[in-house]
Curated annotation (Swiss-Prot):
This is Uncharacterized protein UU152. It comes from the Bacteria. It comes from Ureaplasma parvum serovar 3 (strain ATCC 700970).
């Protein structure tokens, strides 16, 4: 039964008590949602820093890979020169 229908058959004290109880439940639900939202925001902030750390590490790895690739090419060129000079 809806609250408005129940309220018509209640005394003022009963109405006040019922409304007070519903208000308490709504406040509890509101607080729970606010706590969840705060946790979500905290997780997002943490994940932003985690993502930035991963992006930094990725860039570092890419730089290292490119450096190694260049060194490999250099060594291959040196090897080709040695082979060329042996002929």
């Amino acid at each position: 039964m809806k609250l408005s229908r129940r309220l018509t058959n209640m005394t003022n004290w009963d109405k006040e008590h019922a409304l007070s109880e519903e208000l308490r439940q709504l406040k509890d639900e509101f607080e729970d949602l606010m706590d969840d939202l705060a946790r979500i925001n905290k997780d997002l902030d943490f994940n932003i820093w985690e993502r930035k750390d991963l992006e930094y590490r990725k860039a570092s790895y890419e730089t290292d890979i490119e450096s190694i690739r260049l060194r490999i090419n250099q060594k291959q060129n040196e090897m080709m020169e040695i082979i060329k000079n042996d002929k």
